[in-house]
């Protein structure tokens, strides 16, 4: 079965409730049928002119962004934030991570098309003039960080003097990852589906105030006592975790070596960023995960342990709310989720499988297959409300190119037909509600070489503009492929 066969099913298998459908008025234009090909067509003179026009448009769009801007995820992660950050980084002096840890997987491509999968290092690293900051709100796994740096250096990407790690950032140890797995086993039926990268336990250590910070590595005389407290606490909490004196000795010796290597990177990043702002330097904040995984606003407890929404920028970098300007929300043209938790527009049938294959929806961090479904407008409106986005980046529009019809989840209703006005915090309600869908026509043509919005098929434009109309936020960037150049500026 091909993606083109993905049309309305008279009895589709959706994750929750039963869908209602209403058809959006069809387009009155002849539809062109062009077979999609993995090969990029030869660039013609007209395409060259289009590329020049797109370049001019992009400079104007990016140049108008605020001194301190941010790129945040609108859904449950994996929206393609890294690509936009990589593109925008060329116009910013600093790119900063403010929260999360190695559970964030950002995939970017250099000008030669080489793929880089980053987890801790900000996506601006491929731009040689950009300074990359790992802020105080991030939890840092040093073996993982050094592995990323070594991988970048071996591929010709210079990191020396370009990566700054906050002295206030908390360290994530290997035992945090072990404890993360034990915690998931304890949860049994309420399995959250974490990446098991130790993020939750590391933030837990931070909150109960026995965590160890990057700056503590400058005082190796007190590290053994602090590590002993951390490891003893974990052993008392988890029966499956065995703590021995030998483990402590090995960790101390390892972190003595790490401390020496990390020293050139350690910085008071709060001072650095605020001083840079006062010098009129431009700062781009790169969010990890996404709003619907926020510890406060997400589908709790099926969330991450930090704040990937706008509020996390200030607390994770130590900057005032008044200096934060334009925030760009990144949203897929459909919806995906990794791990457990409510997913109102999830398609559990063949349609979800086909979207997964067409979009290559497998996690950057875990490799797990992502759950797939239609774009959830209710969740997107909630995300826009929480963050106050100035604009949106709609990604992976090309994945939908082979569909006859496309659905938008536009409203929620209770089982008795009562409307649900906003994305609810009540998990039981989320499990039981029904989704109302609008059905729009597909465009059935390859859009991967399009670079001007006006050259998109009318049905594709209608899809984009209907999303804008429903959420009330303009879409300024449209992704139509993985490469740097596969972006339309609207």
Curated annotation (Swiss-Prot):
Q: Which cofactor does it need?
A: Mg(2+)
Catalytic function, reaction form: IMP + L-aspartate + GTP = N(6)-(1,2-dicarboxyethyl)-AMP + GDP + phosphate + 2 H(+)
Name its GO BP terms in alphabetical order: 'de novo' AMP biosynthetic process
Q: What is its EC number?
A: 6.3.4.4
Q: Report the InterPro entries cross-referenced here.
A: Adenylosuccin_syn_GTP-bd (IPR018220), Adenylosuccin_syn_Lys_AS (IPR033128), Adenylosuccinate_synth_dom1 (IPR042109), Adenylosuccinate_synth_dom2 (IPR042110), Adenylosuccinate_synth_dom3 (IPR042111), Adenylosuccinate_synthetase (IPR001114), P-loop_NTPase (IPR027417)
Superkingdom of the source species: Eukaryota
Ligand binding (Mg(2+)): 78, 105
Is the Cell division keyword given for this protein? Answer: no
Please tell me one Gene Ontology term that the record gives under cellular component: apoplast
Where substrate binds, per the record, is at: 364-370
Family annotation (PROSITE patterns): ADENYLOSUCCIN_SYN_1, ADENYLOSUCCIN_SYN_2
Transit peptide stretch: 1-45
Pfam families named in the record: Adenylsucc_synt
Chief location? plastid
Annotated catalytic residues: 78, 106
Q: Which GO terms describe its molecular function?
A: adenylosuccinate synthase activity; GTP binding; magnesium ion binding
Its annotated pathway reads: Purine metabolism; AMP biosynthesis via de novo pathway; AMP from IMP: step 1/2
Annotated binding of IMP, by residue: 78-81, 103-106, 195, 209, 289, 304, 368
Q: How is the cofactor bound?
A: Binds 1 Mg(2+) ion per subunit.
Q: Which family does it belong to?
A: Belongs to the adenylosuccinate synthetase family.
Q: What does this protein do?
A: Plays an important role in the de novo pathway and in the salvage pathway of purine nucleotide biosynthesis. Catalyzes the first committed step in the biosynthesis of AMP from IMP.
Return the protein name: Adenylosuccinate synthetase, chloroplastic
Give the originating organism. Answer: Arabidopsis thaliana (Mouse-ear cress)
Q: Which gene encodes it?
A: PURA
């Amino acid at each position: 079965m091909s993606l083109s066969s993905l049309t309305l099913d008279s009895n589709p298998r959706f994750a929750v409730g039963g869908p209602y459908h209403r058809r959006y008025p069809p387009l009155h234009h002849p539809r062109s049928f062009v077979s999609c090909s993995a090969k990029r067509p030869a660039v013609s003179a007209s395409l060259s002119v289009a590329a020049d026009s797109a370049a001019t448009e992009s400079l104007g769009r990016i140049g108008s962004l605020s001194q301190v801007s941010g790129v945040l995820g609108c859904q449950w992660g994996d929206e393609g934030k890294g690509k936009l950050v990589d593109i925008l980084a060329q116009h910013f002096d600093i790119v900063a991570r403010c929260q999360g840890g190695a559970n964030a997987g950002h995939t970017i491509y250099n000008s030669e098309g080489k793929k880089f999968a980053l987890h801790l290092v900000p996506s601006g690293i491929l731009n040689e003039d950009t300074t990359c900051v790992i802020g105080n709100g991030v939890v840092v796994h040093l073996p993982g960080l050094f592995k990323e740096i070594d991988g970048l250096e071996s591929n010709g990407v210079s990191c020396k003097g370009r990566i700054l790690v906050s002295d206030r950032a908390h360290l994530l140890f290997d035992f945090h990852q072990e404890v993360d797995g034990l915690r998931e086993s304890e949860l049994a039926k309420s399995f959250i589906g974490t990446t098991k990268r130790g993020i939750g336990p590391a933030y837990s250590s931070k909150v109960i105030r026995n965590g160890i910070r990057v700056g503590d590595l400058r005082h190796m005389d007190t590290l053994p006592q602090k590590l002993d407290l951390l490891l003893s606490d974990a052993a008392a909490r988890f029966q499956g975790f065995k703590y021995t004196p030998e483990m402590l000795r090995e960790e101390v010796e390892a972190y003595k070596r790490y401390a020496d290597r990390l020293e050139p990177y350690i910085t008071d990043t709060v001072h650095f960023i605020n001083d840079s702002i006062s010098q009129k330097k431009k700062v781009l904040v790169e969010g990890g995960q996404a709003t619907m995984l926020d510890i406060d606003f997400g589908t709790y407890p099926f969330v991450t342990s930090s704040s990937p929404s706008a509020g996390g920028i200030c607390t994770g970098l130590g900057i005032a709310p008044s200096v934060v300007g334009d925030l760009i929300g990144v949203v897929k043209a459909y919806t995906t989720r990794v791990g457990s938790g409510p997913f109102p527009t999830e398609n559990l049938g063949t349609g979800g499988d086909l979207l997964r294959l067409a979009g290559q929806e497998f996690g950057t961090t875990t490799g797990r297959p992502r759950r797939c479904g239609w774009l959830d407008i209710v969740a997107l409106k909630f995300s826009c409300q929480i963050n106050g986005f100035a604009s949106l980046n709609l990604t992976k529009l090309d994945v939908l190119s082979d569909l006859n019809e496309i659905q938008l989840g536009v409203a929620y209703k209770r089982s008795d037909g009562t409307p649900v006005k906003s994305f609810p915090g009540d998990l039981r309600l989320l499990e039981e509600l029904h989704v109302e869908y609008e059905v729009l026509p597909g465009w059935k043509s390859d859009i991967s070489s399009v670079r001007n919005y006006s050259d998109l098929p009318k049905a594709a434009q209608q899809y984009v503009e209907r999303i804008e109309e429903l959420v009330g936020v303009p879409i300024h960037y449209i992704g139509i492929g993985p490469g740097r150049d596969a972006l339309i500026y609207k």
